[in-house]
């Protein structure tokens, strides 16, 4: 009896220390919230691996200001709202938004779709998995790549320095 208990305790300790964690899957009817976040099961879910222009960010297209951030948000919302989305949760970030590795709609990655259509850029601090799609969007001048734009992370830093936290 003591041997079985000891084996069970050791097995649990090994399993807990192995770094393996259970995958958390969220699924349900989604709604677009902003340029890189959706609402799913009453929670805010941020798409993993991308950074899109903030809703207040503008780009220059044809010498004129263009609300590229607002259009990125509209594109994501139009894609997901009212549809069933499935997300694999990776980690909860310091802003208490869920970051997910693979949010899909009909088997297609939402992050990959946003990048392929030029509505977001790859977040190099998270992944380089979308490099091919980003290069193709840039070459085809899709979305923000058809304009002059500041990388979203640089734009946010500049806004903070001006005292306008996005």
Locate the predicted segments by residue:
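Small beta-barrel nucleic-acid-binding modules, primarily SNase/OB-fold domains
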Residues: 2, 6, 13-166
């Amino acid at each position: 009896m003591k041997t079985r208990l000891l084996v069970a305790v050791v097995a649990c300790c090994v399993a807990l220390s192995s770094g393996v964690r259970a995958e958390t899957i969220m699924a349900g009817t989604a709604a677009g919230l902003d340029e890189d976040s959706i609402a799913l099961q009453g929670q805010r879910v941020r798409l993993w691996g991308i950074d899109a222009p903030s809703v207040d960010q503008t780009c220059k297209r044809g010498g004129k200001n263009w609300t590229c951030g607002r259009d990125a948000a509209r594109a994501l919302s139009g894609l997901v709202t009212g549809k069933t989305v499935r997300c694999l949760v990776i980690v909860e970030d310091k802003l208490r938004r869920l970051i997910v590795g693979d949010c899909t709609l009909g088997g297609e990655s939402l992050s990959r779709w946003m990048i392929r259509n030029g509505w977001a850029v790859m977040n190099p601090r998270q992944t380089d998995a979308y490099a091919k799609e980003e290069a193709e969007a840039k070459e085809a001048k899709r979305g923000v790549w058809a304009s002059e734009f500041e990388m979203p992370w640089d734009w946010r830093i500049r806004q903070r320095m001006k005292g306008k936290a996005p």
